[in-house]
């Protein structure tokens, strides 16, 4: 998106198709608060930047690029495994955008694949029964963009409730500025932050 007005139009288009603010935030790689802010047209009144949009379409349009990113993610996982002396049984992809990366990491590391779908309205999400189970597994959680960390926190909580242990979160881009969530280390390929402003 080239401008905030275009971002607003896209958010409004998705809202008119019946998507929730949470679903729109996932689609546009924005925080829920930013989507709410956009849809309220507050951006017309305010001059300050409220969020940073992370667009990774150039990576996602070709499987070869997803594999390249997955190789970097796999390398980070191996580095953390060696540094912190832990093993990994499974790779978990958070729907929708974490799944392609998790699938490739699972393949590259020869680990089971778990698919998790957060529910847009409830606190608990669910694990797809078409993929590996969680119980008794040491799990790396993979997603594309972490804005507030809420989805990752919910995933960690649900993994724990199902008898698994989240040992690491690896994300493409982080807006959070934290190194761990709920005691689980977080590593990202890119970190963003706003410097200065009002």
Curated annotation (Swiss-Prot):
Annotated InterPro entries: GfcR-like (IPR022854), PRibTrfase_dom (IPR000836), PRTase-like (IPR029057)
GO MF: DNA binding; orotate phosphoribosyltransferase activity
UniProt-listed GO biological process terms: pyrimidine nucleobase biosynthetic process; regulation of gene expression; UMP biosynthetic process
Short name of one Pfam family: Pribosyltran
CDD domains: PRTases_typeI
Keyword line: DNA-binding, Transcription, Transcription regulation
Coiled coil: none
Signal peptide: none
Family: Belongs to the purine/pyrimidine phosphoribosyltransferase family. GfcR subfamily.
Domain note: Contains an N-terminal DNA-binding winged helix-turn-helix domain and a C-terminal regulatory domain (or effector binding domain) resembling phosphoribosyltransferase (PRT) domain.
Protein's UniProt name: Transcriptional regulator GfcR
Organism of this sequence: Thermoplasma volcanium (strain ATCC 51530 / DSM 4299 / JCM 9571 / NBRC 15438 / GSS1)
Top-level taxonomy: Archaea, Methanobacteriati, Thermoplasmatota, Thermoplasmata, Thermoplasmatales
Name of the coding gene: gfcR
